[in-house]
């Protein structure tokens, strides 16, 4: 057992709910610290304002402002940490002394001057925070003003201010905190997005995505339409011909972006025959009437009814083992482990509402590895894992949504026709249709903000 610090002050006690988890017990990060200081400032402000004259504004103002300022410093340092994690785009950044620097003006200047050059999406957040951080830096640049009445040169702090209004302070800090939280969300989103590897020296994934939307369909490449699109794209994003070519290669090789040029990437292990074999067996495990009943009930209720659960239990006692055996015999004969893993990855990709198409390939690798380990234990173990997946009622919808999202429209049509689900297409594809429309809207907004580019006019919706 590891040694732990024994202390009469900083230790756990009763009641248990009053114990705070610190250190490795919860592993708080810099954002957790920032949130704590920000919350403390707001709680103190609330108490001072709610209990007029009970808590002296003249004394509470110091911990309030110190907590506010320190929260802002930590939020900015967290953003700089993430800025340095943006793959190859961050390699040219100058070093930053995260521990030694407490000058919030310097901290902000570093982020403000470098972040938009890494990714243009930072610009609007920088613009929204610049004046506010400047105000903080003008009063307390190094975090000393609200901690001590005098500075190192024995100069009295805050002589030029005299009065700070707590009501106004609360309003302004709420605004600043909201913008800092927005910065935190954007930084975390970009850190994950860049981890996918879909970017070039000067283009983010979103830029490449917009380029995909501006290109004509793949069948028209080599025509005047492609040359015109290339000229518009190079002008809008200020990129060389070589970088344009790199962006085009990313578009062609990205499952999600390839749909925008009407050239969906085939699945590695499944064609229509594999899907037919899978769903023929799936309908052997899931009663057709139950499937249709599930499709026609409240879309917000994705669970089976208690009555259905009871029927399923009785059916399993009376003969479900036989149905599982028949389904497994068919699936194991007609589908490879990799094909099953690919189908399950389509379902899992959509079930977890992943934002990026690249995550499907990550899911496929993970699920195929999991199934391989099950098979290494024994075929029965592998078969149970596959059957447990196949018995899930939402599998059909999840797979269809994923196929629709990746532009496999003909395959979706074949599956709907084969299983007499065409009348339920709107319900089955509602979510993926919304996401397809939303990604087009996102491209349009990005192009509107950053230079007035336009879509090819033939982007699949």
What are the functions of these language-model segments?
Residues 1-461:
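Domain-scale activation on soluble regions of proteins
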């Amino acid at each position: 057992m590891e040694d732990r610090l024994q202390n009469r002050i900083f230790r756990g006690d009763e009641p248990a709910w009053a114990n705070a988890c610190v250190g490795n017990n919860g592993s708080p990060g810099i954002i957790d610290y920032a949130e704590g200081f920000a919350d403390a400032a707001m709680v103190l402000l609330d108490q001072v304002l709610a209990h007029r004259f009970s808590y002296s504004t003249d004394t509470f103002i110091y911990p309030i402002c110190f907590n506010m300022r320190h929260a802002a410093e930590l939020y900015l340092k967290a953003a700089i940490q993430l800025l340095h994690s943006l793959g190859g785009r961050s390699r040219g950044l100058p070093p930053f002394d995260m521990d030694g620097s407490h000058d919030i003006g310097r901290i902000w200047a570093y982020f403000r001057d470098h972040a938009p050059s890494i990714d243009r999406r930072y610009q609007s957040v920088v613009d929204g925070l610049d004046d506010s951080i400047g105000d903080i830096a003008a009063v307390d640049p190094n975090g000393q003003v609200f901690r001590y009445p005098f500075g190192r040169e024995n100069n009295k702090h805050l002589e030029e201010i005299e009065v700070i209004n707590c009501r106004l302070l609360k309003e302004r800090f709420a605004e600043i905190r909201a913008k800092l939280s927005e910065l935190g969300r954007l930084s975390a989103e970009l850190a994950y997005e860049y981890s996918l590897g879909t970017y070039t020296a000067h283009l983010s994934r979103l830029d490449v995505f917009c380029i995909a939307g501006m290109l004509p369909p793949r069948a028209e490449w080599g025509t005047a339409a492609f040359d015109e699109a290339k000229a518009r794209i190079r002008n809008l994003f200020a990129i060389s011909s070589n970088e344009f070519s790199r962006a085009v290669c990313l578009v062609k090789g990205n499952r999600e972006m390839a749909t925008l040029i009407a050239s969906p990437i085939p699945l590695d292990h499944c064609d229509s025959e594999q899907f037919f074999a899978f769903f023929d067996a799936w309908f052997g495990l899931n009663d057709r009437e139950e499937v249709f009943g599930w499709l026609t009930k409240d879309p917000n209720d994705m669970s089976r009814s208690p009555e259905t659960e009871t029927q399923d239990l009785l059916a399993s006692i009376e003969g479900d083992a036989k149905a599982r055996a028949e389904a497994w015999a068919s699936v194991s004969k007609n589908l490879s482990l990799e094909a099953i893993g690919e189908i399950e990855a389509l379902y899992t990709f959509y079930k977890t509402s992943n934002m990026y198409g690249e995550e499907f390939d990550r899911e496929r690798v993970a699920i195929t590895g999991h199934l391989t380990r099950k098979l290494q234990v024994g075929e029965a173990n592998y078969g149970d894992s596959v059957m447990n997946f196949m018995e899930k009622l939402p599998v059909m919808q999840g797979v269809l949504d994923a196929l629709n999202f990746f532009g496999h429209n003909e395959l979706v049509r074949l599956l709907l026709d084969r299983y007499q689900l065409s009348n339920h297409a709107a319900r089955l594809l509602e979510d993926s249709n919304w996401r397809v429309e939303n990604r087009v809207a996102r491209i349009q907004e990005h192009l509107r903000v950053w230079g007035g580019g336009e879509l090819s006019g033939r982007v699949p919706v």
